[in-house]
Amino acid sequence: LTQQGREEGIRRLMSINLLKRLESSVYSFRLTVDRIRKLIDGTIQTINNYQSGGCVLNLTEISDDEDFDYDDQNTDLFSVGKKVKIDLADMDYVSWKRELEKDAENLELLSLMIADITPEHDTKLQTLFDLIRKKIEHPINPGNRKLLIFTAFSDTADYLYANVSKFAKEKFGLNTAEVTGVVEGKTTIPKLRADLNTVLTCFSPISKGKDILLPGSSAEIDILIGTDCISEGQN
């Protein structure tokens, strides 16, 4: 595998990752675009500093892992080449900077194109609201109002929880929870622990033995939003 082939592979991975994020939600796509833009801006600034005084470019200094969320860190897009030290004197940094500036302009254009897509104008989110409404008003099984919403990205889960929980509570008085395995979960039930086991118990009280694990608790979760962490260790 040549260096040129490796770099072409990285470019393709970047494109695929962006498309996956866009397919998931415009919110996740926007976050990733902003993170890449931040990385590029940091690199351009490092080149400017070198032109002013000279230094060694350390990619680990340009972007710390905390700059990216858990989803982004688990893609090859952000794991290739970050630990390599590069002496700018050994490369055509002028051309590199020019290409980075073009990338920054394109990313800025993408940000502007999606800036007006608020939750109210997010067709995919509004379609989900319609599906929830139909499920609640016309359940397959009488009285069954349970909904399980899966997503590949924790950013999308956050976005869905922020909007679905409000919609479900205001329209139908239903409680919503979110679990992603990255941070502590969330729920609209006051004072309820939002760890995975508690959330699953309140979402599926019969199969999880809620009457034994949480005796006297009337809390019940109707809508659960999460990533594949929900299925870990579950039958």
For each feature predicted by the language model, list its residue ranges.
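Surface-exposed acidic, glycine/proline-enriched linker/cap segments
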Residues: 190-215
